Every structure is written in C-alpha cells, then in structure tokens.
Amino acid sequence: MLKTITDLKPSRFLFAALLMGALTACAIPPSDDKEAMAEFEKANDPFEPANRLVFAANVAVDQLVLQPTAVTYRDLFPNELKPPIENFITNLFMPLSFLHSLLQGDMERANMAATRFFTALPTFLLGNTMPDKQPVFEDAGQTLAVWGFEQGPYVMLPLIGPSSLRDTFGTIGDFFFDPVGWVTDTPVTIGRATGNAIVRRSNNIDQVRDLQRNSLDYYAAVRSLYRQQREDQVRNGGSVPVQPAP
C-alpha cells in the first residue's frame, strides 16, 4: 500500500517539535577562553545540552530493551537461521542504495545494488542464503555530502542516535522517498529498521561495552566515532569526488 500525505504529516510535526526543542537548549560559547572556544568550534555541537539529554535517554533504552534483545539474538537464536534473516533485511535496503548511487553519479555501485537485490530473491528461494554480491549501503546524507553539503552541527536523534544537521534532513528525505516504503505498508519499514537495529547491535555488543568502560566522556567518544564512520561511508572507504547537485 502506498503511503499517503496524511500518513506522513505526523512525522513532520514530530521532527519539527524535536528540532525546536534542540534549538532552545543551545550550548553557550566560551568567548573568554580561546582554547575552549577552539574546542567548542571543533566539536560543532551547539545543541550539546539537548543532545546529552537525548543521548542519556537513548542509552537507557539501549540498556533496557535493545541490548538485551541483541544479546538474546546473538547467543540463543539458531546460527543456521541468522544468514537468511540478515540477508533478507540487508536486501530491503538495496533499492534505496540503488537510488542514491544514481543520484551520486556512481553507476558501478548502482549496478552492485541492483544486482544484489534482483539476484538475492531467486537464490534465496532456491536455498542459497549467502548471496555472492556484496551489499551497498547509501543514503540521502551521503548523497548530500557528495553534492557538497557540509555535515553541519552534531545532532542526537531520539532512538535513531548520532546524526548531523545534514544527515537529519537526509533521514527525513529517505523516509519520504525510500522505494520500499512507497510500495509496502509501514509495518514492513518499521520491521526492517527494528531487525536491522537488533542485528547491528548484536555485532558490536563487546565493542560498545569497551567504549563505555574506557571513555572519559562516552558522549564525546560516540560523537567522534560517528563522524569518523560517516566520513568513511561518504568516501566508500576511499576518495570520492564532490559531484554537483542535479
């Protein structure tokens, strides 16, 4: 079933409310201390007070819900059933990755995403749970980056986690234009996001624990790690030239 505008409006209002809440809780620049001011500008986190509150709430949800679910999946779920489930979830991201690869002018990755999507289903039905083609993950935030848009201020989104102003608008864009979202019911999109979150969390349980244990400031460590990972994703692990927006 296609989404209608009335289905989407509540999400617009929710995002507007969250953004306004962040804007009313901006950090105050330390204007009298040059070193502190340099650190403040480097962090590019003017919404830090609000971001830290959201971060604390996200950590609580993770510890109460997501982490226990991910541990159960990792330790108790039958290993032979994990590959087909994880590959099915991954393949549901390929149409969006195909779209953004085209928008970025990357025909090679567009072909990889399309090939992965269209060959995975028949091979899955024939019993091959490990497709030969590697997945490609692209999103609107990466497309905006390739078009030359800067990251902008750091933003911590409820439940979604670390983001930037650019990637926040990208998340909204993907919600509207995700091909899977347009041709399926909302529960399918929610199920994909939930399943992906559980699988990803099950793969980094020990790493997250180490980061929490060894970080003087867990929030700042997550912020730094997120930015490094996003830069790597934008470059696809290498150097990506900036393309003009169409």
Predicted regions and their residues:
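Mid-length scaffold segments of soluble, non-membrane domains
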Residues: F88-L165
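Membrane interface segments of multi-pass transport proteins and intramembrane proteases
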Residues: L64, A70-L81
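C-terminal motif of bacterial Sec signal peptides marking the signal peptidase cleavage site
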Residues: A22-A25
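Terminal hydrophobic membrane-targeting helix
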Residues: A43-N44, P78-I85, L102-L103, M107
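A structured, mid-to-C-terminal "fold-capping" secondary-structure block
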Residues: K34-E41, L144-P246
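Bacterial signal peptide processing site
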Residues: A27-P30
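Post-signal peptide N-terminal segment of mature Sec-exported envelope proteins
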Residues: K34-L64
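Bacterial N-terminal signal peptides that target proteins for export
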Residues: L2-F15
